[in-house]
Structure formats: C-alpha cells, structure tokens
C-alpha cells in the first residue's frame, strides 16, 4: 500500500511472534512498517496511523488479509492464532461490507485486535458496533493498561483475549511491587477472558520474571518480527 504523507511511503508487513511460557509459538500479529520510497526512512504503524485516510486504512487492512491468505495453511498446520489490528474507522465497514466481512470471516484462526482508544470502549456491551463485532469475531484488547479505558468492556465479556500494554509493563517492571501487582491483575481479569497475555518482554531476564506470574502468552523484543519468508524458522526452534 502507498501512503501519501509528507512524501510517499509504502507499507511492509511483518509477523510479530507471541510465545507461551516455554517460548513456543502460539500466534502471530501482522504488523506494518512504512518505508520512504528511497528506503532511507522507516516508521512504525503507530506513528503513521493517525495520518492515514479511511481509504488508506481500508487498503492496509485488506493488504493484511491478503497476506494472511497466502500463508493460511501454515497457521492451520501449526494451530496458530493470527491477530490483525482493527482501526475504529474500519469497524463499521467490516460489518456493513459483505465482501470484506467474508474475507475476514473465512479464517477460523483470525482474531481482531482493538486498542484502548477505540471510541466508546467504556460503554462495553452497550457499544452496538463493538458488541456486534464480538458476536462475529474473537476480539483481543491489545493494550490494556495504556490508561485510555476502564475495565467495563473486559468484564462485559467482549474480549476473548487481553494483552497488557508494553509501556505499562516496562514502567511497572522498574518497581519492587511489579510481581504482586501483576498477580493482582491476573486474579482480577482472568475470569473475564480466555487468555491474559503480556507485552513488553524484551529480554530473557524480563521473560524469567513474567513467566511464573500466570500469563498465557508473551510478546516483545525478545522475539522480533519476521517477514513471511522466515515464518517456518519460528516453528523449527
């Protein structure tokens, strides 16, 4: 996809691994970076996304679905989950556009990731769009703890999985209360979702601290993103 910012950028897609407590692959999040045409500048999606038009967000979402289609047998064979971030601007389109809906719904292993800044998230199941999405697709709250939402949508059972925000984790990790605080979150949230995951695991030391705390999966710089050509290496370790 080509994005028109201060100059032209093209999207490049990668797979960000999610591991279990034994460092075995359980799923992959499809993420995008944006590179300038000359390749000199690269930017992550979170910096570019606020500047993308609805049409560009739609194209990026479709591009991710197309990539997923090319490697769906890999996900099925290895019983892996795929996560795609769903921008708020695409939520209604996904429910209203039958072709787009069918393209997403055809993957039984696909789950949609929602961020805390999703409009009306604090309404929980009273948010009609969010409730309808949860009826048709497994949802993951991708950055719980970012400080932009309450726990209502979680306790309303809208999310199959909850991922703790990487910045929240890295800030808390510096405190001596990290372990008991994480135990408290696990105790509070676990009964409201199928899986509680943690991001921000950038080192072996951090993985060793987080692994015994009751989380089902882990994501971070310890397992960097890979292009589609290197997917098979993730299951050969």
Swiss-Prot record:
InterPro entries: Cyclic-di-GMP_PDE-like (IPR050706), EAL_dom (IPR001633), EAL_sf (IPR035919). This is Anti-FlhC(2)FlhD(4) factor YdiV. Acts as an anti-FlhC(2)FlhD(4) factor by binding to FlhD, decreasing its ability to bind DNA, and thus negatively regulates expression of flagellar class II operons, decreasing motility in nutrient-poor medium. Required for resistance to host phagocyte oxidase. Suppresses killing of macrophages, while promoting resistance to hydrogen peroxide. Data regarding c-di-GMP is controversial; suppresses bacterial c-di-GMP levels but neither synthesizes nor degrades c-di-GMP. Disruption phenotype: Decreased bacterial resistance to hydrogen peroxide and accelerated bacterial killing of macrophages. increased levels of c-di-GMP. Down-regulation of rdar morphology, 50% reduction in CsgD expression, cellulose and curli fimbriae, increased swimming and swarming. Decrease in c-di-GMP levels. Derepresses transcription of flagellar class II operons in nutrient-poor medium. Keywords: Repressor, Transcription, Transcription regulation, Virulence. It comes from the Bacteria. The multicellular rdar morphotype is characterized by the expression of the adhesive extracellular matrix components cellulose and curli fimbriae. Interacts with FlhD in the FlhC(2)FlhD(4) heterohexamer, inhibiting its ability to activate transcription. Belongs to the YdiV family. One of its GO terms (cellular component) is plasma membrane. One of its GO terms (biological process) is regulation of single-species biofilm formation. PANTHER family: ANTI-FLHC(2)FLHD(4) FACTOR YDIV-RELATED, CYCLIC DI-GMP PHOSPHODIESTERASE PDEF. GO terms for molecular function: cyclic-guanylate-specific phosphodiesterase activity. Residues 1-237 form the EAL domain. Induction: Induced in nutrient-poor medium (at protein level). The gene is ydiV. SUPFAM superfamilies: EAL domain-like.
